[in-house]
Each structure stands twice: as C-alpha cells, then as structure tokens.
A protein has these predicted regions:
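Hydrophobic core segments of alpha-helical transmembrane domains in multi-pass membrane transport
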Residues: 2-3, 26-31, 55-63, 101-114, ...
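Juxtamembrane membrane-interface segments at transmembrane alpha-helix termini
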Residues: 3-10, 36, 60-68, 212-221
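Transmembrane alpha-helical segments in multi-pass inner-membrane proteins
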Residues: 23-25, 151-230
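Helix-capping/transition residues at the boundaries of transmembrane alpha-helices
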Residues: 40-42, 116, 190-191, 218
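Transmembrane helix-bundle core of multi-pass membrane transporters
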Residues: 47, 51-118, 223-225
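Helix-loop-helix "hairpin" substructures at the membrane interface of multi-pass membrane proteins
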Residues: 95-171, 195-196, 200
C-alpha cells in the first residue's frame, strides 16, 4: 500500500505501480523474515515466538500509519482510503476473485515443489530441517540454509500481503491478515513439507473459517464449531 501511495497522482501506468507494489511487498517480507531467522540462528529464539514477536511490531507500525499519516480525513474506522481501481488486480466480474492472484499462487506452489523435490538445494534444505546437527557434520552450511529458508518464506508472505491489498481488500486496515499466519502454521504442519497438498488443505481451512459466520444464520449452529473442527 505504501508503494502505491508514492505513485498516486503520477503518470506511471497502473500495471507498473501494481508490479512495484508486489515487488515491494516481497522485499519487505524477505527482510522481516530474515530478522526472525537471525534471532533463530544467532540468538536461539524459537522461530514461532520470534515470528509472533515481530508480528506485534509489524502490527504496531501498521496501526501507527493507518491511524496516523495515512488516515483519511473525517474517518475513524481503522482503514486507509480505498485505492483507485487502476491500482487493482483484475477481478472476475461479480466476485472478489482475481485470476491473476490465483495464477500467481498456483505458480508459487509449483515453484516450491520443484525446489524441494527436484533440486540439490531443496534436498539440502530438507536435510537441515530434519536434522540440523547431522547436516552440519556432513558439511552443509546449516546457518546459511536456515536463513535462506526464512528468506524464501518471507518472500511468499510478502507476496501474499501485496496480493491481498491489490487483488482483494484494496485498502490497508486494522487486522487485514485475519489470522492467516496462525492458520498457515496448522496448514504447514498438516502438509508436512508436501507443497502440492498445501493448497487443498489451506482451501479446506479457509472454507471452514469463512463459513463460520453462516453457521449461526443458516444452520442455527454455534459459529465456534469451525474452530473446533480446525483444532
């Protein structure tokens, strides 16, 4: 969102601005994840706790912008001004679905699958994840590979955030992530380093999460049932 704000009112084509916003999101995610990786490697901080800590910092920075310099005049709903449509990824008419965002997600799954299953780098990466000490004894630079894994994860996290702003929400608002990070932890553990099954598992979890609101209205069931099923 911040990258797009830099170009509002300029003559830069909307498509180029969207591309720059996505690249900015990717680099932001990579840097943020690298900080967590450095804490893990050189401070012994568990990646989950380190990630949660940095999430709070990121939320604080975002809130200071949303309620500060990026706040629209006369509005106090914790949301920035809606982006102009030229800065939106194309959507299927009548829906919130962006085929561009969906296509990028599919390409991401394929790329990760190829890296983990079809490259020497991926083999080493999995070895480090399975047994760090044994990998080190075999001559693999474990610290470097651990940091690279964090950077790759940050790349996709930043890409996801950029696509969420340009392809779906079109604003930056409080709690924009909707707890997807915690959902991602469960999906990742269930997938067990199998990228191809990550997408269907994520689809099921998101369906349960989004359908929770309709349980009370349509089926007269407690909306917390979806949380019980996910747990």
């Amino acid at each position: 969102y911040g990258v797009i704000r830099l170009f509002i009112g300029s003559d830069t084509p909307g498509g180029m601005v969207i591309l720059l916003a996505i690249v900015g999101g990717i680099f932001g995610g990579m840097i943020w994840a690298l900080l967590v990786g450095l804490l893990k490697n050189f401070g012994g901080v568990n990646e989950i706790f380190g990630g949660l800590g940095f999430n709070f910092i990121a939320d604080a920075i975002m809130l200071s912008l949303v309620y500060g310099p990026w706040k629209p005049e006369g509005v106090a709903n914790g949301s920035t001004k809606m982006l102009e449509s030229i800065y939106w990824l194309p959507q299927v008419k009548g829906t919130y679905l962006s085929l561009w965002a969906l296509g990028i997600a599919i390409v991401g799954v394929v790329v990760v699958t190829i890296i983990l299953k079809g490259t020497y780098f991926g083999l080493k990466l999995k070895a480090v994840g399975k047994n760090n000490k044994s990998s080190f004894l075999l001559g693999i630079p474990t610290n470097r590979y651990m940091l690279l894994s964090f950077v790759l994860c940050g790349l996709f996290a930043g890409l996801t955030g950029a696509l969420q702003v340009t392809g779906f929400n079109h604003v930056l608002r409080n709690n924009i992530s909707g707890g997807y990070g915690y959902l991602g932890l469960m999906v990742g553990m269930l997938a067990n380093i199998q990228p191809l099954i990550t997408a269907p598992i994520a689809f099921v979890f998101i369906g349960l999460s989004k359908g929770a609101a309709g349980l009370g209205m349509d089926l007269k069931l407690d909306s917390n049932l979806s949380g019980v099923i996910q747990g």
